């Protein structure tokens, strides 16, 4: 039977009272279902698959950090704080930028990257006004390559259908990232390290079923971002492209079948003879007041899959399927406006666009940085102060917009206005330099 009920303790208990199940599977209900584990366990309801104790070990920061330390697996330094002064002290001790987020976060909700004391104060004022009960986590933000692994384990062996690499660097929610399988810039030695770490974590957490692990590579070292003791949104994607029925295998493992008897082997699964790219789909044309800048907070509402003989073909198919316009018009113009942190990096991107025949337009500070090395660029006024930006969009002279900005409220309003007009006109607005 199928029930359409909210995942609240009382509603779930009513269903259990009617159905009288032998146990409950929480691994396929996302983070909301995982948060019910302690409650169900305290009521004597058997948890099928990974135990409540193991789930708590993966979710509890101190216990999980102790596990990582035992295996000498790196993680970005961080602290849990409850007040404004503690947050500022932690941020300055760790060094900016830092990642701020509530404990037990869902979908990256209320997660931000802060670059200075003022941004920490602004964030903590919002969080503290909501009367938080759990600590706010302050983590050192490391900008590196991000990877994601879905693992099936029976407690003795593990099967890793595939390792996915994000095109965007860390700091963008995994649901909003473009994910590529197999990874496109990871060497065999690092790939083996990822497999070894995944096996250690899955087995030491006594996983029975699915577990999702997110990694980053920073300065040649592997770091664990987080471990989710459940199925992730990438399970349908990786199942489709590898041919491994992950949900079916995980369910069989949860009820006691050994992984080796299921016919898909153990360890890292064989690579297919093609490349698969997962591209997020956004709904900003309907959610007009949303801030479209990619961040640790998830904003996508769907995803599409592109397959190709190589990464370029798969990415092209994925972008077109997601609704992006990827051809040049007769004018072939690109509007660029980036914050100070991104200005050194935009120079090489602008040079490549210039070599491809695009006409470049940029706001004052960005234009100065681009022209410093001799790239031709036409200066337009700042957002919110010069209508020329919108005139260029309306005239059809802009094919793409590259836009990254500060977290100042005034700037965000201008950003939302510009992004919404781009969506209305069908002009791709890129908010991440990757």
Which role does the model predict for each range below?
Residues 11-19, 87-93, 388-396:
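Short amphipathic alpha-helix with an adjacent loop that forms part of the alpha/beta core around
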Residues 294, 300-313, 317-366, 371-373, ...:
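C-terminal accessory/binding modules appended to enzymatic or scaffolding proteins
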């Amino acid at each position: 039977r199928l029930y359409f009920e909210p995942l609240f303790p009382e509603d779930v208990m009513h269903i259990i009272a009617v159905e009288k199940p032998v146990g409950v599977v929480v691994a396929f209900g996302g983070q909301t279902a995982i948060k019910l584990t302690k409650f169900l366990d305290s009521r004597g309801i058997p948890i099928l698959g990974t135990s409540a104790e193991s789930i708590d070990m993966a979710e509890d920061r101190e216990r999980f950090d102790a596990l990582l330390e035992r295996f000498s697996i790196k993680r970005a330094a961080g602290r849990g704080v409850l007040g404004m002064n503690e947050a500022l002290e932690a941020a300055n001790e760790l060094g900016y930028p830092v990642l701020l987020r509530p404990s037990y976060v869902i979908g990256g909700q209320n997660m931000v990257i802060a670059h200075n004391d003022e941004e920490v104060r602004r964030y903590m004022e919002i969080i503290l006004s909501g009367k938080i009960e759990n600590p706010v986590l302050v983590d050192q933000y490391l900008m590196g390559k991000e990877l994601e692994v879905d693992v099936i384990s029976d407690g003795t062996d593990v099967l890793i259908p595939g390792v996915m690499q994000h095109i965007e660097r860390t700091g963008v929610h995994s649901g909003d990232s473009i994910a590529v399988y197999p990874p496109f810039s990871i060497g065999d030695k690092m790939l083996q390290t990822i497999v070894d770490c995944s096996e250690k974590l899955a087995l030491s957490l006594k996983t029975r079923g699915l577990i999702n692990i997110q990694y980053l590579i920073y300065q040649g070292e592997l770091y664990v971002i987080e471990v989710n003791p459940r199925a992730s949104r990438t399970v349908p994607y990786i199942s489709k492209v590898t041919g491994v029925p992950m949900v079916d295998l995980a369910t069989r493992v949860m009820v006691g079948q050994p992984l080796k008897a299921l016919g898909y082997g153990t360890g890292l699964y064989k690579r297919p003879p093609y490349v698969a790219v997962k591209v997020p789909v956004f709904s900003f044309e309907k959610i007009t007041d949303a801030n479209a800048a990619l961040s640790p907070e998830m904003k996508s509402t769907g995803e599409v899959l592109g397959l190709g003989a190589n990464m370029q073909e798969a990415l092209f198919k994925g972008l077109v399927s997601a609704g992006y316009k990827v051809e040049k018009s007769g004018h072939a113009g690109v509007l660029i406006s980036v914050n100070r942190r991104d200005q050194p990096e935009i120079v090489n991107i602008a040079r490549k666009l210039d070599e491809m025949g695009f006409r470049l337009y940029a706001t004052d500070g960005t234009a100065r940085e681009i022209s410093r090395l001799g790239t031709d660029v036409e200066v337009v006024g700042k957002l919110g102060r010069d209508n020329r930006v919108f005139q260029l969009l309306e005239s059809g002279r802009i094919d793409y917009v590259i836009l990254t900005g500060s977290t100042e409220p005034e700037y965000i309003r201008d950003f939302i206005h510009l992004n919404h007009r781009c969506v209305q006109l069908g002009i791709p607005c890129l908010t991440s330099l990757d």
